[in-house]
Amino acid sequence: MAARRKARKRALEVLFEADQRGLAPLDVLKDKILRADPPVGEYAVTVVEGVVEHQARIDEVLSTYSMAWPLDRMPAVDRALLRIGTWEVLYAADVPDHVAVSEAVEIAQELSTDESPKFVNGLLARIAELKETLSA
């Protein structure tokens, strides 16, 4: 699982950088692949491409269930991490929901604010709970 964790972090770096610099995530991804320092793994590419492909729906789901936290008011790290976690829950059939949630929470503990892990856990757990209705 360590390889997947690294891939999630790498995908987070790409999405965060794109968000902060106002660039297209796929352009940032291509740049990172070309520089390959550190290398961008296959799963990181899959995650970024998946988030980009489904971003409108992912953002709609996050906006609906994040209650009083509009996406643009969330810390950028949390926003990127929640997009990754939501993509894994809704679209990555090979990732169990509990793994997607716990990985996102652990990365939030490492990289975000003190409040973020609880917020990420609650929101992604709710999305996982409603997965069947959200995927329809």
Swiss-Prot record:
Keywords: RNA-binding, Transcription, Transcription antitermination, Transcription regulation
Pfam name, any one: NusB
A GO CC term attached to the entry: cytosol
Source taxon at top rank: Bacteria
GO molecular function terms listed in the Swiss-Prot or TrEMBL record: RNA binding
GO BP annotation list: DNA-templated transcription termination; transcription antitermination
HAMAP family registered for this protein in UniProt: NusB
Its biological purpose: Involved in transcription antitermination. Required for transcription of ribosomal RNA (rRNA) genes. Binds specifically to the boxA antiterminator sequence of the ribosomal RNA (rrn) operons.
Family: Belongs to the NusB family.
Protein name: Transcription antitermination protein NusB
This protein's encoding gene: nusB
